From Swiss-Prot:
<dbReference type="InterPro" id="IPR001865">
    <property type="entry name" value="Ribosomal_uS2"/>
</dbReference>
<dbReference type="InterPro" id="IPR023591">
    <property type="entry name" value="Ribosomal_uS2_flav_dom_sf"/>
</dbReference>
<dbReference type="GO" id="GO:0006412">
    <property type="term" value="P:translation"/>
</dbReference>
<comment type="similarity">
    <text>Belongs to the universal ribosomal protein uS2 family.</text>
</comment>
<keyword id="KW-0150">Chloroplast</keyword>
<keyword id="KW-0934">Plastid</keyword>
<dbReference type="Pfam" id="PF00318">
    <property type="entry name" value="Ribosomal_S2"/>
</dbReference>
<keyword id="KW-0689">Ribosomal protein</keyword>
<keyword id="KW-0687">Ribonucleoprotein</keyword>
<dbReference type="GO" id="GO:0003735">
    <property type="term" value="F:structural constituent of ribosome"/>
</dbReference>
<dbReference type="GO" id="GO:0009507">
    <property type="term" value="C:chloroplast"/>
</dbReference>
<protein>
    <recommendedName>
        <fullName>Small ribosomal subunit protein uS2c</fullName>
    </recommendedName>
</protein>
<dbReference type="InterPro" id="IPR018130">
    <property type="entry name" value="Ribosomal_uS2_CS"/>
</dbReference>
<dbReference type="InterPro" id="IPR005706">
    <property type="entry name" value="Ribosomal_uS2_bac/mit/plastid"/>
</dbReference>
<dbReference type="GO" id="GO:0005763">
    <property type="term" value="C:mitochondrial small ribosomal subunit"/>
</dbReference>
Length: 234
C-alpha cells in the first residue's frame, strides 16, 4: 500500500472537536491506547493517533479507488445523514444514511429484488404510467417508491457487495458493522471512547457525535477516494 501526504492538521482537528470523547464512566477500556487524558470527567482522544489512523485509512481508500473498487458509506444518526449523502455523492460512493435494513448485505438477493422493484417503479413514474392508473393505486405505488427512495436511494446503483465500508458510528451502526464482519468486507470506522476498536479493520479514534468531527474525517477519506479515482482515469 502506497503512503502519501494527506495534510492532516492537528490544530484543524482540535477546532473540529475531534478530540472530545465521552464521559469517563462510559468508556470502553479497549480504547485506552487512544486516550490522551481526561478533563472534567470527559476523555480526551490522542489526536496524534487519530492522524496516524486517518492517514492509514486515506492510503487504503486511495489504493482501492485506484483499482476501481466500490465503497459503501454508512451513517444513519441524525448528525451524519446529510454529511454522508453529500460526501458519498461527491466521491461517487454508495451510501446508507437512513435506517439500515437488516440483511441489506447478508441477504443480498433480497436487496437486489428490492432494488429492481425500485428501478421498475421509478421507470413507471418517469414514463407517466402512474398518471394512467386509478388514483388509489397510483398513490399506493408512489408511497412504495418514496419508501424505497428513502432507504435504498443511496445504493440504487450498487450491483454487488461493496469492497469496503466506511462507518461513521460504531455503536449506532452495529448491525451494518456486523454484516460486514460476517461477509469479510473490510471496514474503516470512527471509534469514540465508548467503542471497541477490535471490531473494525481500521479504527479512527474520533468524536463520532459532533458534526464538524464527522465532516472532517469524511472529507479526508472521500478526497483520498477522489484522488485515487482520478489517478486511475489517467
Amino acid at each position: 500500500m502506497s503512503k502519501r501526504y494527506w495534510n492532516i492538521d492537528l490544530e484543524e482537528m482540535m477546532e473540529a472537536r475531534v478530540h472530545l470523547g465521552h464521559k469517563t464512566r462510559k468508556w470502553n477500556p479497549k480504547m485506552a491506547p487512544y486516550i490522551f487524558t481526561e478533563r472534567k470527567d470527559t476523555h480526551i482522544i490522542n489526536l496524534a493517533k487519530t492522524a496516524r489512523s486517518l492517514s492509514e485509512a486515506c492510503d487504503l481508500v486511495f489504493d482501492i479507488a485506484g483499482r476501481g473498487k466500490q465503497f459503501l458509506i454508512v451513517g444513519t444518526k441524525y448528525q451524519a445523514t446529510d454529511l454522508v449523502a453529500s460526501a458519498a455523492t461527491e466521491a461517487r460512493c454508495h451510501y446508507v444514511n437512513r435506517k439500515w435494513l437488516g440483511g441489506m448485505l447478508t441477504n443480498w438477493s433480497t436487496t437486489e429484488t428490492r432494488l429492481q422493484k425500485f428501478k421498475d417503479l421509478k421507470k413507471e413514474q418517469d414514463t407517466g404510467r402512474f398518471n394512467q392508473l386509478p388514483k388509489k393505486e397510483a398513490a399506493m405505488l408512489k408511497r412504495q417508491l418514496d419508501q424505497l427512495q428513502k432507504y435504498l436511494g443511496g445504493i440504487r446503483y450498487m450491483r454487488s457487495l461493496p469492497d469496503i465500508a466506511i462507518i461513521t458510528n460504531q455503536r449506532e451502526e452495529s448491525i451494518a458493522l456486523g454484516e460486514c464482519r460476517t461477509l469479510g468486507i473490510p471496514t474503516i470506522c470512527l471509534v469514540d471512547t465508548d467503542c471497541d476498536p477490535d471490531l473494525v479493520d481500521i479504527p479512527i479514534p474520533a468524536n463520532d457525535d459532533g458534526i464538524a468531527s464527522i465532516q472532517l474525517i469524511l472529507n479526508r477519506l472521500t478526497s483520498a477516494i477522489c484522488e485515487g479515482r482520478a489517478l486511475r482515469s489517467l
